[in-house]
Amino acid sequence: MEDGRTDDGTPPVIVGPRGELSDSKSRDIMSRLKQKTGSAELIQANLSLMETLGGPPLTARNHVTLLVDGPETFASMSEAISEAKEHVNVETYIFDDDEVGRHFADLLIRKQSEKVQVNLIYDSVGCMSTPPAFFKRLKDAGVHVLEFNPVNPLKVKKAQLLTNRDHRKLVVVDGKVAFTGGVNLSGVYSKGRSMGSAPGAEAQSGWRDTHVRIAGPSVAQFQQLFLETWRDQKGPELDEKKYIGEMKPEGRAYVEVIGSTPGALNRLTYFMYISAIKNAKSFVHLTTSYFIPDKQFVDTVTDAARRGVEVKLILPGVSDSKLAFYASRSRYEDLLESGVKLYERRSRMLHAKTAVIDGAWSTVGSTNLDLLSFQYNNEINAIILDTDFADAMEDLFNRDVAASNEITRDAWSQRPPWDRVMEFFSRIFSGTL
């Protein structure tokens, strides 16, 4: 692809507020993107890959707001839901029966009473600890409630559906504003809950996470993904014409919405990460709560470091899963040997799933860098092509680095024997994580 064109000479498809742009406008946008970001190969490879795999087109004129941690995210989502006039669609892995969960349940019930249709998808495994009465209250109020792939053996039709979980976190309000990222509807963001931890890194406060608020044409793509899941799970019929309408320009960011599902050709988020890291020229900065990928992904990361790209990876110093904590650490040796810089976040459980590459390409979403997210779960990520947003992401990344302990090769070689044993056995079972 050269000068904003694909291999057959046509520019990539770009969607604006009024629909698909002409070839000439798309070509102009690609030219401006290359000039502004200086990351032509990275952006072109990403768009070419998505077109080849049948992924969604790039959308123009979006406004993206970075939301840091639960309280800020909850406040922004609450404000948007409170102002809803037509509908609210919520898709979440966890919806806890705690102070935060009850706040949102009350808010959704209030909006339903105001004739705003509320549609909710919750994951059966993620909400296993939430009592059925919690969701019955929502149903009784008129909210359409859908349980994703029920664990109940009497309800599930195929065994493989037990491993296919809906790990997405998505809220769409009136088809105009969307929220996505790593934040579940849970009170863990105001208080800690951890099991495994590095020495001196015990949890002291709520979880550290990242979310985004997006307005603009890309919201239609978020809405479409929600509606697809709703149909697949046999939810009550919805008049989709009421959910996807005319979009307005809201900002200057270019956004691509990636929804991945199980299946060799449906792992769009995995392929997106591989492509972006392979085409990085300057730096790759990754933040994830679990790092348990396959060999190809690890090789892609280490190859980038060996060719001179600055690769930094922030992981939790405290975790909600001891097995996942040590399974992630079992990959440290290969990463450190290649020159990857590793950091473990102190004091707070790190739950963010983000990346910023070469100061131009960013992603925020629900996808962990592990086999569950890449192979078995329904996940959702926003790819943002905007240097201002990338600057904000980089600032947040550096703040997390400052609040982390760097893992050096010397320090890693001196870790206790018991840690090595835990890493060995955790790696054996990492395929189940």
Short names for language-model regions:
Residues 270, 277, 298, 311, ...:
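A general structural signal for well-ordered alpha-helical packing
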Residues 280, 290-312, 316-317, 321:
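Helical hairpin unit composed of two closely spaced alpha helices linked by a short loop
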Residues 264, 288, 292, 319-326, ...:
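A short glycine-/small-residue-rich loop at the edge of a beta-strand within enzyme catalytic domains
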Residues 295-299, 325-327, 357, 377:
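Histidine/acidic-residue-rich catalytic or RNA/ligand-binding cores of hydrolases
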Residues 1-271, 275, 279, 303, ...:
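N-terminal localization/anchoring segments of enzymes in phospholipid and broader phosphate metabolism
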Residues 309, 313, 321-368:
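C-terminal structural cap/anchor segments
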